[in-house]
Amino acid sequence: MIFVISPAKALDFETPPVTAAATQPDYLREAEELIGILRQKTPAEVAELMHLSDPLAALNVARYERWHRPFTPDNAKQALLAFNGDVYGGLDAPSLSEDDFAWAQQHLRILSGLYGMLRPLDLMQPYRLEMGTRLGNPRGANLYAYWGDTLAEALNRLLAAERDAGGSAVLVNLASQEYFKAAARAKLTAQVITPVFEDWKGGRYRIITFYAKRARGLMSRYAIRNRVEDVEGLKGFDAEGYGFAPDVSDAETLVFRRRAD
């Protein structure tokens, strides 16, 4: 079973990492090519392209200029510890054990506009490049064209290895639509399951964005801590009051609901 999540805009490169274990990203050559394209843009162009304020655009232009290989623990940080948004608050990576990180390294992947796909312990340098950014490149007008079938093929290899090892060849999509689109679902050869998280509000269950993002992180953490290897194990997710709702779930969508009475 393989889990995919989105990255985060917020980053934490100040807090020392809780583990020394680190690996190199698989798509550094591609990341370097994209950085080269971004370096050609002025702060004003970056602000327009990414809908950023002038200070944020200037910050990211400086990041592109500083970006360089090789990645080391002195100039980069493990991806699962570097991202710091709502999903990562729920995942709470700093409290994971070394064994947890080792399991996550095999079963969790982070989709990224710049790095393509990251393992939890892959070193990364700070950046801002959302997958939906219309950044022209040699392969097309946006990052979906740039990554093409690359990420789907990588996931297919991972899932085939899971199956060959006697595991469950199921991809659990905990990423946003923007990011999972880059995985080219039509090219994926394994079963895809998408968990949905709903909260009771205004007399009905609905998806509340902040809570849903946090819940994706909570489920990722649940899978890591409990070494979840199959769909039945996933249905046991019960963090922070959520519970599996079989009556509104199906083979492709697992719905988890929470109601605070």
From Swiss-Prot:
<protein>
    <recommendedName>
        <fullName>UPF0246 protein AZOSEA34360</fullName>
    </recommendedName>
</protein>
<dbReference type="GO" id="GO:0033194">
    <property type="term" value="P:response to hydroperoxide"/>
</dbReference>
<dbReference type="InterPro" id="IPR005583">
    <property type="entry name" value="YaaA"/>
</dbReference>
<comment type="similarity">
    <text>Belongs to the UPF0246 family.</text>
</comment>
<dbReference type="GO" id="GO:0005829">
    <property type="term" value="C:cytosol"/>
</dbReference>
<dbReference type="Pfam" id="PF03883">
    <property type="entry name" value="H2O2_YaaD"/>
</dbReference>
